[in-house]
């Protein structure tokens, strides 16, 4: 498993981000999805293939996290192999090309977010099929090289259920074995909710904050294991 750098999050996830499966991290804007993905890549050995579809990956932010943790900047930053995908077609091609790039030296793949271009497409049926194929490629890579795959996901408002829901919920839920939802309660306070896990009870909650170091536990607030 890969550590998240947070004792509480690791405990919530049964030890950390597991290898050989897809882990979905979803939530509204500015809840910490990108920071969490970067931090996991930062703190674990092995290369990271990072596909940025939103322009959210910030080398400056990553460098600040490295500096704040007293890590060696050169060796750490060189672990990240960054790809940009500006539309859904390019995203599909980039994920497919990972089969030629990823090897045993990689510990993680990140697609942040995998639904950014999906949500603006009109032909949702064909796009969902393509999205499923992309997820299958990622799952194949996860199993072949025993690495972790994090796919971040955006949300939409479901008026019928009066709740925020992850985009492409059915196909994402089918392919992703572990699902983590992030929420912002108030400035400086966020929560992570375990929505699905292969062996941990669903509904566990931990609190965290975002600092210069990245994601950090908030010890003063007792983590709850009850469903929201």
Curated annotation (Swiss-Prot):
Gene Ontology MF terms in the entry: ATP binding; ATP hydrolysis activity; ATP-dependent DNA damage sensor activity; damaged DNA binding
InterPro entries named in the record: AAA+_ATPase (IPR003593), DNA_recomb/repair_Rad51_C (IPR013632), DNA_repair_and_recomb_RadB (IPR011939), P-loop_NTPase (IPR027417), RecA_ATP-bd (IPR020588)
Domain of life of the native organism: Archaea
Record has tRNA processing as a keyword: no
Gene3D superfamilies found in the cross-reference section: P-loop containing nucleotide triphosphate hydrolases (3.40.50.300)
Pfam families linked to this entry: Rad51
UniProt KW keywords: ATP-binding, DNA damage, DNA recombination, DNA-binding, Nucleotide-binding
NCBIfam families with a match to the protein in the record: recomb_radB (TIGR02237)
Entry protein name: DNA repair and recombination protein RadB
Gene source species: Thermococcus sibiricus (strain DSM 12597 / MM 739)
């Amino acid at each position: 498993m890969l550590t998240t750098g947070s004792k509480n999050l690791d405990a919530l996830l049964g030890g950390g981000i597991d290898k050989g499966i897809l882990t979905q991290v979803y939530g509204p804007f500015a809840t910490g999805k990108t920071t969490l993905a970067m931090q996991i890549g930062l703190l674990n050995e092995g290369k990271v293939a990072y596909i940025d579809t939103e322009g959210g990956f910030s080398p400056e932010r990553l460098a600040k996290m490295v500096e704040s943790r007293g890590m060696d900047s050169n060796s750490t930053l060189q672990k990240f192999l960054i790809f940009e995908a500006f539309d859904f077609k390019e995203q599909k091609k980039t994920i497919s090309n990972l089969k030629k790039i990823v090897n045993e030296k990689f510990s993680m793949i990140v697609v942040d977010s995998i639904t950014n271009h999906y949500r603006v497409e009109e032909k949702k049926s064909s796009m969902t099929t393509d999205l499923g194929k992309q997820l299958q490629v990622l799952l194949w890579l996860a199993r072949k090289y025993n690495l972790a795959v994090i796919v971040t996901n955006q949300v939409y408002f479901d008026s019928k259920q009066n709740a925020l829901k992850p985009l492409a919920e059915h196909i994402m839920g089918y392919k992703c074995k572990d699902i983590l939802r992030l929420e912002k309660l108030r400035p400086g306070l966020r929560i992570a909710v375990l929505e699905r896990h292969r062996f941990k009870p669903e509904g566990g909650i931990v609190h965290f904050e975002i600092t210069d170091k990245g994601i950090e536990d908030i010890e003063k607030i007792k983590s709850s294991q009850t469903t929201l």
